[in-house]
Amino acid sequence: MSAKSDSRNNKAVKSDEPKKRRRKKARTAEVSDSDSSDSESDRAEEDDNEDNEDTTNHVIDEGDVEMMEFDKDDAAAAASAQTMDIPAELQSLPADSANPEFQKFYLNLVTSEFGKDMDELRTSKTFNDNTLGLLVDALKQGVNVFDEKVQGEIVQQQS
């Protein structure tokens, strides 16, 4: 048998194997005019070389494992650094800086004005414990729109 027929026989055996990722790359790669002049035997050699490269890439070295562990340490350090980036004036604020009397007044006003909308939210299929917390937090954020002086004036007017 000639070398060409051997390579064709090998191709028949390889076609029984599951397709590899390189097949997808071959379909999506752009082909220039110079590539179209390649012969079938050159393409077969390139396919064989790619097969060998695919199997060698699956071996993990100890250095790779060390790099993965290093990446995990970097991710943990980055997460802790993000919590440290909070400005000092925001860290010193209490959890709820609004006047409690004003907060009560504001939340009662909002719930009475938007009662129908809130009922629609509560009866929707997507409403659950998590979204309840989000709704409450969103309503409480409206209190922070007013500064302390305005909050005090509104509370005095209501009393």
UniProtKB/Swiss-Prot annotation:
Protein location: Nucleus, Nucleolus
A GO cellular-component term linked to this record: preribosome, large subunit precursor
Coiled-coil blocks: none
UniProt key word Nucleus: yes
Location, primary (coarse class): nucleus
Complex formation: Associates with nucleolar pre-ribosomal particles.
Name the UniProt record assigns to this protein: Ribosome assembly protein 3
Lineage, broadest ranks: Eukaryota, Fungi, Dikarya, Ascomycota, Saccharomycotina
Gene: RSA3
